Design a protein with these regions (language model features):
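DNA-recognition helix of helix-turn-helix
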Residues: 75, 79, 126, 135, ...
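Short, charged helix-capping/linker segments at alpha-helix termini
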Residues: 10-19, 29-48, 59, 141, ...
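Hydrophobic positions on the alpha-helical face of helix-turn-helix-like DNA-binding modules
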Residues: 49, 73, 130, 143-144, ...
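Internal acidic/polar
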Residues: 2, 80, 88-112, 116-117, ...
């Protein structure tokens, strides 16, 4: 069904494009949420992906599965959004009189939030690998397809991320 909708959307059929977006929106939003940790940011990222999809649908050639290609679009949009937020945060901190300190984590939900926040603070490639493998449940091979690298590179990025998270969080098991 996707193949037919893609072909029609590539030909300019707006109804087919709308159906394609509807079929995959929840996937895009869930992926965006996993990367951002915020439903508001996920809404923004998903909207950006839908707009971008309209501009680039004609470039999809079927070399990979559509969902893998869409994953890559979402990943890139999430990265761009994260960079934008980092720039805004820098600007805010430059003008803020006293930055607020986060409250310490106390329960399991807060620990989980602390862990995912630490994951999102990792270097970009490590963050991507961890979110794809642990957040999205992809195999190292599937994560490598999305990231455009080898399976060994994904394994190494995950290993390095785990070491860094153990240090940052002060935990034996991460």
């Amino acid at each position: 069904l996707d193949a037919e909708l893609i072909e029609r959307a590539q030909g300019g059929d707006r109804e087919a494009f709308g159906q394609l977006v509807s079929r995959h929106y929840d996937f895009v939003h869930a992926t965006a949420w996993r990367w951002s940790g915020s439903s508001t940011d996920a809404d923004d990222i998903a909207q950006e992906v839908c707009v971008k999809l309209g501009a680039v649908i004609r470039s999809f050639r079927g070399a990979s599965r559509f969902r893998t290609w869409l994953y890559t679009l979402t990943l890139n949009a999430a990265r761009d959004h994260r960079r934008k937020l980092a720039r805004e945060e820098q600007t805010f901190r430059a003008y803020a009189a006293e930055p607020q300190q986060d409250a310490p984590a106390g329960n399991d939900d807060e620990l989980s939030s602390e862990l995912w926040a630490a994951v999102r603070a990792l270097p970009e490639r490590q963050c991507d690998a961890v979110l794809l493998v642990y957040g999205e449940g992809l195999s190292h091979s599937a994560a490598a397809d999305v990231m455009g690298c080898s399976e060994a590179t994904v394994s190494w990025q995950v290993h390095e991320a785990r070491k860094r998270l153990k240090t940052v969080l002060g935990k034996e098991e991460v």
